[in-house]
């Protein structure tokens, strides 16, 4: 065997000599990489043969077998890469000669030859290379118009409002556009946002550190000198720790190769010792990391300051794997076992006040050390603890659920439900289910979860002062899940141990009635005891609401039925000494918003129709029924000939108003409109509030649906409606704006603006005097806007009943061909801008300067949400140039306002372009004096422009303006000092 290998090796060497050692040995007769790898994996190549091959290739032959193999494999792969590069170049030259020799075809077909290209990418390149299609598609992108990146910078709105915010920042950094990150505050927001520990985030931070450091290769004219990570190492360590960002801290330390002593010093100076003591899951991760690189000062030892936030670290809503990690991080971070051993050696443990906790904890740690995470299935690790302990996926208990005793062990129980049962044992396969617990290899999962919780609680009891033990009371859920007592006994413990607070009452009843699997008879007994005043000394009247809510929200028909029957019996036997309970009809109506399935509605309809208000004629209760059940509710109510009452002034949940209003319009035979006593003036105010609440949920189609099927008697005042949508935190309402201005031309707007009343004697001119009425014409497409109300989609046309034309006060039911709306000039221009109709704006500027640049209107256009305030740098510069070209006593104010906005937003390039123009810079950015009357602005006005850039922390722009504008030395020094104080 070895002799054969030698022959193959000799052949390799000869081949290498002939080919300048550039071959990878793939040809016939050679020891090829493929054959070499196959022989090794099959076990036919022994250690001695590997050494011979390595020596023949000039490689080291010492070390373990796998190490020698890796060297040889690396040799083959490096040869292959080199040959591929050489061969590719040779092949390209050969192909080029062939192409020159052959006649060129008239039309060349491009074919992708890569084998690993995704199918979608192939389509992309086909489109990319088709000039006609490419231009059509990319003409829809309005990056110059919006340019939200330079408009808002890297603040919390960008970070939290855009799912691709990291990619946006990366693109801007790579293109050396540092407008996206203007100051250290932006970077702190980034550190607070991007914490995921994956390759993408790690690469992002490495890019960030490389560009914002003293060694950066970024052009000096672009890099903001105020941001350099390596200039304040200790401060950035502090910020990353306090923002609990493990990924940023880890990459920061590695990138700048920070010594552990430097980290210790930074922590000692800038981090309070109690910071890590107030333990959270992520803080433990950072603490253990710093401990692993020997960077925790002795003053910050965790054990001496530790306290635990039970509500987050040990929540039963956490995944099982998080509980395991929390336990390990807590035990590892404190060196608990080492400290225990030291105490034991010193004999201190014998007199330790918490000795009993130490012994129990030590036993639990030994038991948990025997358990490996690999023993659990992925399903178990990624399930919540509550879900695993409840045996079933949290859901409402159905009427067919068996009332046999529920089990807390892994023994499978037979129920008549089809609910998904989780595996409660550790098993050797990946199955999520188990039907037996007799196998010795199976371990009860509930007991393991309990051990983890128990160990953490014992750890706390062992490490804290005995006087503070009452602070670390085990949470109520731990008691409910792990104590094997009857429900009535559990409730007594709630009263005694947890003082029976409202929160504990609510938690107890919700878990007992809805989540925890307990024998149904015990739940019945608890209901009976509460209603029979067994707990009268502890159960207060204010707790009744909590109790009723828990019963009705369970959506368990058996439970609700039993509750209502006992309550009815109590009311029949009621005496002055007993608790007075609400009548059944009121209770059902008050808690009907908890109904989440049709069966509950049917139950009330069949058994309590006459007692409750739910199905009465012209009732208001229907508004509380969940939208997903409203169609079934309508069917039940209509089946007995009753109608629902729609009273706009008694509506309490405006976020659901439009969906319900559209239903009433669609089914006027089932709903009765009660708009009596209202006046038309109030409708705009009411409708604005309803629109505001619906824009947050992006329900613009609901708004359009209503306006398409209700003939308004008076123009709709849209300015305040759209005003609220211009807030950066809200939806832009582009769909609604397109709907309004769909068929309104610039000529029709011009006509309306011409007749506007420009005369006013009011010095404090109000915007209400600058409004116009426009008419929207609805097309067939518009009037059939789809809306989703009950889970099924239908068009507005199909939803309408045959009964149309009903006058309901504010409007007349029925499809409308057009409607009028009132809009202010300021909002009009903003809407045109949003619709990318800037050419129309310029058209109106040219046609109606006396209207749009009227001095009385100037205050309107200094607001934040005006045309110039929302413009991107591209369009703001366009407006600035327009005012320069059309300069007069009116436009000069608008020009100055735009320059102030550009300064505040840090649009540095606008000012660079002005400076580069000798003509513009002389009268825009030079001080107007007696000797220089060609300049437009005084020293104070130009000073204010600079101050706005300083206040916005745009120091690059500030320095640019200070250096160029001819301020006095005193004014320059004052401005520079202001920059220093702002840093």
From Swiss-Prot:
Compositionally biased residues, Basic and acidic residues: 1-21
Region of interest (Disordered), ranges: 1-26, 391-413
Biased composition annotated in UniProt, kind: Low complexity: 392-413
InterPro entries: SAP_dom, UPF0746_actin_org
Signal peptide: none
Domain of life: Eukaryota
A GO molecular-function descriptor: DNA binding
Keyword DNA-binding: yes
Domain SAP: 42-76
Keywords, sorted A to Z: DNA-binding
Family statement: Belongs to the UPF0746 family.
Protein name as annotated: UPF0746 protein DDB_G0280809
């Amino acid at each position: 065997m070895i002799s054969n290998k030698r022959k193959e090796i000799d052949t390799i060497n000869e081949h290498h000599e002939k080919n300048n050692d550039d071959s990878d040995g793939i040809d016939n007769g050679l020891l090829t990489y493929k054959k070499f790898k196959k022989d090794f994996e099959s076990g036919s190549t022994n250690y001695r043969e590997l050494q011979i091959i390595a020596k023949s290739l000039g490689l080291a032959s010492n070390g373990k077998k796998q190490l020698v193999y890796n060297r040889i494999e690396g040799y083959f792969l490096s040869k292959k890469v080199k040959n591929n590069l050489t061969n590719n170049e040779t092949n390209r030259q050969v192909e080029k000669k062939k192409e020159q020799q052959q006649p060129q075809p008239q039309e060349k077909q491009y074919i992708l030859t890569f084998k690993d290209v995704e199918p979608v990418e192939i389509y992309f390149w086909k489109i990319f290379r088709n000039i006609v299609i490419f231009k059509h598609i990319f003409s829809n992108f309005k990056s110059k118009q919006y340019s939200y990146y330079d408009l808002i910078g890297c603040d919390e709105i960008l970070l939290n409002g855009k799912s691709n915010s990291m990619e946006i920042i990366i693109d801007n950094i790579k293109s050396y556009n540092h407008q996206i990150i203007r100051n250290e505050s932006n970077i702190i927001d980034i550190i607070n946002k991007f914490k995921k520990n994956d390759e993408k985030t790690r690469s992002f931070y490495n890019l960030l550190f490389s560009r914002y450091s003293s060694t950066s290769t970024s052009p000096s004219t672009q890099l903001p000198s105020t941001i350099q990570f390596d200039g304040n190492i200790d401060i950035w360590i502090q910020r990353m720790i306090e923002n609990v960002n493990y990924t940023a801290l880890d990459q920061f330390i590695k990138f700048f190769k920070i010594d552990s002593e430097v980290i210790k010093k930074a922590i000692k100076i800038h981090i309070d010792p109690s910071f890590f003591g107030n333990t959270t899951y992520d803080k433990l991760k950072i603490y253990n990391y710093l401990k692993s690189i020997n960077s925790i000062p002795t003053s910050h030892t965790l054990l001496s300051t530790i306290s635990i936030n039970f509500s987050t670290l040990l929540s039963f809503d956490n995944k099982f794997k998080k509980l395991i990690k929390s336990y390990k991080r807590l035990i590892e971070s404190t060196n608990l076992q080492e400290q225990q051993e030291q105490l034991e050696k010193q004999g201190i443990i014998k007199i330790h006040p918490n000795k009993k906790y130490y012994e129990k904890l030590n036993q639990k740690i030994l038991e948990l050390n025997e358990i490996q995470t690999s023993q659990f299935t992925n399903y178990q690790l990624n399930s919540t603890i509550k879900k695993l302990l409840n045996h079933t996926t949290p859901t409402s208990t159905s009427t067919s659920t068996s009332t046999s005793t529920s089990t807390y062990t892994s023994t499978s129980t037979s129920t008549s439900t089809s609910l998904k049962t989780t595996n409660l044992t550790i098993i050797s396969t990946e199955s999520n289910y188990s039907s037996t617990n007799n196998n010795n290899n199976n371990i009860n999962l509930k007991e393991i979860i309990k051990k983890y919780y128990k160990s953490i609680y014992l750890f706390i009891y062992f490490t804290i002062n005995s006087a503070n033990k009452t602070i670390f009371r085990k949470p109520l859920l731990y008691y409910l899940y792990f104590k094997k007592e009857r429900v009535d006994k559990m409730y007594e413990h709630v009263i005694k141990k947890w003082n029976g607070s409202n929160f504990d009452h609510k938690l107890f009843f919700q878990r007992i009635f809805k989540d925890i699997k307990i024998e149904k008879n015990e739940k019945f007994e608890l209901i009976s005891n509460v209603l029979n005043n067994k707990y009268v000394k502890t159960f207060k009247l204010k707790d009744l609401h909590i109790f009723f809510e828990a019963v009705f929200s369970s959506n368990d028909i058996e439970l609700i039925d039993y509750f209502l029957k006992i309550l009815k019996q109590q009311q029949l036997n009621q005496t002055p000494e007993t608790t007075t309970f609400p009548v059944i009809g009121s209770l059902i109506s008050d808690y009907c918003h908890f109904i989440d399935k049709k069966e509950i509605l049917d139950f009330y309809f069949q058994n309590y129709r006459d007692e409750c208000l739910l199905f009465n004629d012209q009732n208001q209760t229907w508004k509380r029924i969940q939208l997903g059940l409203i169609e079934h509710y309508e069917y039940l109510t209509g089946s007995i000939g009753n109608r629902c009452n729609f009273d706009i002034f008694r509506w309490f949940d405006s976020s659901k108003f439009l969906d319900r209003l559209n239903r009433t319009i669609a089914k006027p035979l089932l709903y009765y409109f009660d708009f009596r006593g209202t006046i038309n003036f109030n409708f705009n105010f009411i409708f604005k509030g309803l629109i505001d609440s619906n824009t947050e949920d992006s329900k613009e189609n609901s708004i359009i649906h209503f306006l398409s099927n209700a003939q308004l008697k008076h123009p709709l005042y849209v300015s305040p409606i759209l005003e609220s949508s211009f807030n950066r935190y809200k939806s832009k309402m582009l769909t609604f704006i397109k709907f309004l201005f769909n068929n309104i031309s610039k000529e029709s707007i011009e006509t309306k603006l011409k007749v506007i009343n420009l005369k006013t004697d009011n010095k404090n001119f109000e915007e209400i005097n600058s409004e116009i009425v426009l008419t929207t014409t609805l097309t067939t497409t518009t009037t059939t806007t789809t809306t989703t109300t009950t889970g099924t989609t239908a068009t507005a046309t199909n939803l309408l009943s045959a009964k149309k034309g009903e006058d309901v006060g504010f409007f007349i039911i029925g499809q409308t061909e057009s409607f009028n709306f009132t809009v202010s000039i300021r909002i009009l221009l903003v809407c045109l801008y949003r619709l990318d109709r800037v050419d129309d704006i310029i058209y109106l500027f040219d046609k109606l300067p006396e209207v749009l640049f009227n001095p009385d209107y100037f205050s309107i256009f200094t607001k934040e949400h005006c045309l110039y305030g929302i413009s991107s740098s591209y369009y703001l510069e366009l407006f600035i140039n327009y005012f320069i070209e059309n300069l007069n006593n009116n436009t000069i104010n608008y020009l100055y306002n735009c320059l102030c906005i550009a300064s505040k937003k840090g649009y540095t390039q606008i000012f660079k372009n002005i400076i580069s123009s000798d003509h513009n810079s002389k009268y825009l950015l030079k001080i107007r004096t007696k000797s220089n009357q060609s300049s437009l602005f005084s020293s104070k006005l130009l000073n204010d422009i600079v101050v706005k850039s300083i206040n916005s922390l745009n120091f690059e722009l500030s320095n640019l303006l200070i250096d160029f504008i001819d301020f006095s030395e005193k004014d320059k020094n004052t401005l520079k000092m202001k920059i220093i104080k702002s840093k």
